[in-house]
């Protein structure tokens, strides 16, 4: 991570690390079942999605769902309902599988046939910072290409260090004031 803003809140500036903002922005591209897991419809949809493929069973295993086939069949037939802990695990498994399933599409959309994606970077919020400590920062936008496959893979793997390295590559294109954008209030794009 770039250096001078390591102690972000020292003068009451508010924001988050660029790597975190990058992960959040990718996460916001993932859509799925809107019904809550504890609703009849939400549970049924998640169970159908998870039991359709071997990858779904692997996602349930990663989420810590270790029930007998008989119990799983009872859930699918709506004869029994999972307890709260298993509902949370089912939801986690669903979103884990959903992320993995949409990764290829995300890479395709963000790479945009080699054209990349225009990213808007909003600087840290300095409204609470005393005037003498404020920096003159404006929203910046730049076209980002060549990093999206790595970024999506790092996001899937929850690899914060790799996302941080990617963010540093992105902000290098901002020129001499890149360091001021190591922390941001938000980033966004339309992909």
Please report, for each region that a protein language model flagged, where it lies by residue.
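Short, amphipathic alpha-helical "recognition" segments used to contact nucleic acids or chromatin
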Residues: 35-55
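Intrinsically disordered, low-complexity, charge-dense segments enriched in Lys/Arg
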Residues: 2-5, 12-20, 103-191
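Basic, amphipathic alpha-helix used for nucleic-acid engagement in HTH/winged-helix/SANT-Myb modules
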Residues: 1-42
């Amino acid at each position: 991570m770039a250096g001078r803003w390591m102690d972000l809140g020292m003068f009451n500036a508010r924001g988050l690390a660029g790597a975190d903002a990058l992960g959040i922005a990718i996460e916001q591209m993932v859509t799925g079942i809107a019904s809550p897991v504890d609703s009849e419809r939400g549970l049924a949809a998640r169970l159908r999605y998870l039991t359709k493929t071997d990858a779904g069973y692997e996602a349930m295993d990663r989420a810590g769902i270790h029930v007998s086939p008989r119990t799983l069949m009872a859930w699918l037939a709506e004869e029994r309902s999972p307890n709260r802990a298993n509902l949370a695990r089912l939801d986690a498994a669903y979103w884990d599988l959903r992320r993995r399933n949409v990764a290829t599409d995300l890479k395709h959309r963000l790479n945009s046939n080699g054209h990349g994606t225009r990213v808007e970077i909003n600087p840290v919020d300095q409204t609470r910072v005393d005037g003498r400590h404020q920096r003159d920062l404006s929203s910046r936008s730049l076209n980002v290409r060549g990093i999206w496959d790595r970024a999506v893979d790092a996001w899937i793997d929850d690899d914060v260090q790799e996302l941080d390295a990617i963010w540093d590559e992105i902000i290098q294109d901002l020129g001499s004031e890149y360091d001021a954008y190591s922390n941001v209030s938000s980033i966004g794009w339309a992909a």
